[in-house]
Amino acid sequence: MINNDGHRLAFHVTPGHLPAIVLDAGGGLDSSYWKDLVPKIAAATGSEIITYDRAGLGDSDEVPGPWKVESAVGDLETGLRALRVTRNVILVSHSQAGEVAAYFTRGNRQLVSGAVLVDASLPELYTDEEIARLVAANKPQVDAAKADPSTKENRQLIATAENYAPMHQAYHQVSWPDSVPATVIVSEKTPFDGSPEDAQLWRDAAAAFAKAGPDRTLITAVGSSHDIPIERPDLVLSEIEKMATARG
């Protein structure tokens, strides 16, 4: 456990060499999401593998109030410092963790040597129109959570929803550093499998992100849902291995 700003964070390390590979799961998910992939990545790359639970998830302490990406970035920075990881980090970020990756990479360009963004939440998606659509679509689920805040899952959902619109308006303006290569894996079905319009916007955002800078590659996980690491671990492993070889 690593302490930061009054709360404890659970980090898990598989020893190895650089580049260090940091796996970050999506919203509401903890480090166990990667349990089947970790030994495969370690065997394929020989790299140090780091997984962790963001605040309020898994074994990490909850933090009261709205979820703030800046706080999540600070937690990851503190964790890596405590683990003495000071260079050559590859981020593997799924879904909401893409937001953490974008801000973290902007603030730590000398630390991050590459990223594999797995159906990640990317800035290009969040126009004012799409933010309004997503807030409206999520309202019934958020209202249900507010009616029963006794579970950790519901409290995390409420925390994420509280600051959603202004946070994503700011995120829409964030750009990925040109100096950091990124592989973008987008699912065919996306998180919005029941909404063709939102699903297309998600895929379009991934394509726009990939075109917006050098050393970016777009790959579609054909037939996959949002859970690419679960349904297509072979693809995720292959792209991590390629990035690790290139940055090793």
Model-derived regions, located:
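Conserved catalytic-core motifs of eukaryotic protein kinase domains, centered on the activation segment
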Residues: 34-35, 60-66, 127-128
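Flexible "cap/lid" loop of the alpha/beta hydrolase fold
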Residues: 115-150, 157, 204
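Conserved serine/cysteine hydrolase catalytic core
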Residues: 144-224
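Conserved hydrolase catalytic core segment
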Residues: 87-124
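Alpha/beta-hydrolase-fold catalytic nucleophile elbow
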Residues: 53, 118-119, 185
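Active-site loop/oxyanion-hole signature of alpha/beta-hydrolase fold enzymes
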Residues: 45-92, 135
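Conserved HGGG/HGGXW glycine-rich cap/lid loop of the alpha/beta-hydrolase fold
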Residues: 5-59
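Catalytic active-site module of serine/aspartate enzymes centered on a nucleophile-bearing elbow/loop
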Residues: 214-248
